[in-house]
Amino acid sequence: MKNNKIYIKTWGCQMNEYDSALITQILKQKHGYENTKDPKLANVLILNTCSIREKAQEKVFHQLGRWKKLKQKNPNLIIAVGGCVATQEGKNIYKRANYVDIIFGTQTLHYLPNMIQEVKKNKKSVTNIDFPLTEKFNFIEYPRKPKVTAFVSIMEGCNKFCSFCIVPYTRGHEISRPVDDILLEISTLSSRGVKEIHLLGQNVNSYKGKTFNGDICKFSNLLRLVASIDGIDRIRFTTSNPFEFTDDIIEIYAEIPKIVSFLHLPVQSGSNRILQLMKRMHTIDEYKTIINKILKLRPNIQISSDFIIGFPGETLIDFEQTLQLIKDLNIDMSYSFIYSPRPGTPASELQDNVTLCEKQKRLHILQTLIRNNTTMWNQKMLGSIQSVLVEGRSQKNPKELFGRTENNRIVNFKGNQNMIGEFINLKITKINPNSLRGSYEKRNN
């Protein structure tokens, strides 16, 4: 196995990124596989997929088509497809790509080593997209040299069943990891240099994990426990649901400074009528109340959200209400997309009566408003001193470094290699469309 190499391509959410890292750890540390950045050098190609939107799903088959050429040159090459498309489509993937060897689900990635061996032995395709009792988290192997920031999944799945969303069908019902398992993972990461933890879950604030004595731990209490771990200086979490963003979570913003002043809280629409069609479990007033309560505790917190544009039945008035919500709350970051019907969801049965041209027009208007809000926030930061966690070398200029502010802004600057992994003070000197520039400011003793 020492000469075996794997190449993993990941699409989709941060949970997929976490899963890909877990796949890498399992295959490398327990089974001797080495990562390669060149698919031409790999013995196993793994595609970790997303099915949230139609275009993302089609990208999978385009990518598989490119890998088919590598398979033709090397018949022993193993191609594996995992993630949400794999769970949703199952063996139907073979109909469009019969050269695929393995199909595994979001909850069966820990079986991948055995599936690879089975393909090698029997020369037949293998499929496992079940939701097994054995949790994949039991197979975590911690990286020896992690980055200074790390994702940690605390729960998976969703019980909300919004009418547009495929996630409950591809990730299953909500399952919370035991508290001790999470704390052990974070403590281990901290001991190896991680200073910022990003807690993950499809509905992260619905976390209800068990303690060692069988008690249920709420999300707010988990945050307290994570904050108590030595070496962890920043805590982020994604993705929250307004329905369960309760007062005990809101109060954490006053209690724990390690919780960053940045919140991603998807609302999807500014219209109560559309929210009902989406089967969302909150109203606009309830959403505003949550944000305003947090703003009283953290006046400088920045809000990010999700918006679906052109949901079936969305009128111009509904859309204008969405724009007004963005203005009222100064939302300055978003994941905003044109509605894409997912087969098998209740919304796919609704009449899609908004033209593509109109959807594109509305999306442009909304994203322009968001960009304007981003510029406004960035201008407020110009000249300020920001505490930045230095993550590594800048992608655009390897001679420079980059870090992230507490409110999730990327800052590029000139600095020394030994700054990586440290918190430093940067003066914001310039604003760019997607990042900031800064200059190093020595701390006063």
Swiss-Prot record:
Primary gene name: miaB
Name of the protein described by the UniProt record: tRNA-2-methylthio-N(6)-dimethylallyladenosine synthase
Subcellular location field: Cytoplasm
Family label: Belongs to the methylthiotransferase family. MiaB subfamily.
PANTHER family in the cross-refs: CDK5 REGULATORY SUBUNIT-ASSOCIATED PROTEIN 1, MITOCHONDRIAL TRNA METHYLTHIOTRANSFERASE CDK5RAP1
Keyword Magnesium among UniProt keywords: no
Positions that bind [4Fe-4S] cluster 1: 13, 50, 84
Segments forming domain TRAM: 379-442
Radical SAM core domain ranges (all copies): 144-376
Main location: cytoplasm
GO cellular component, one term: cytosol
HAMAP family linked: tRNA_metthiotr_MiaB (MF_01864)
Binding site for [4Fe-4S] cluster 2: 158, 162, 165
Gene Ontology molecular function terms on file: 4 iron, 4 sulfur cluster binding; metal ion binding; N6-isopentenyladenosine methylthiotransferase activity
Reaction(s) catalysed by this chain's protein: N(6)-dimethylallyladenosine(37) in tRNA + (sulfur carrier)-SH + AH2 + 2 S-adenosyl-L-methionine = 2-methylsulfanyl-N(6)-dimethylallyladenosine(37) in tRNA + (sulfur carrier)-H + 5'-deoxyadenosine + L-methionine + A + S-adenosyl-L-homocysteine + 2 H(+)
InterPro entries: Elp3/MiaA/NifB-like_rSAM, Methylthiotransferase, Methylthiotransferase_CS, Methylthiotransferase_N, Methylthiotransferase_N_sf, MiaB_methiolase, rSAM, rSAM_horseshoe
Cofactor: [4Fe-4S] cluster
Keywords: 4Fe-4S, Cytoplasm, Iron, Iron-sulfur, Metal-binding, S-adenosyl-L-methionine, Transferase, tRNA processing
Pfam families registered for this protein in UniProt: Radical_SAM, TRAM, UPF0004
Note on cofactor: Binds 2 [4Fe-4S] clusters. One cluster is coordinated with 3 cysteines and an exchangeable S-adenosyl-L-methionine.
Subunit structure as annotated in this protein's UniProt entry: Monomer.
UniProt-listed Enzyme Commission number(s): 2.8.4.3
UniProt enzyme class: transferase
Domain MTTase N-terminal per the UniProt entry, residue ranges: 4-121
Domain of life: Bacteria
Role of this protein: Catalyzes the methylthiolation of N6-(dimethylallyl)adenosine (i(6)A), leading to the formation of 2-methylthio-N6-(dimethylallyl)adenosine (ms(2)i(6)A) at position 37 in tRNAs that read codons beginning with uridine.
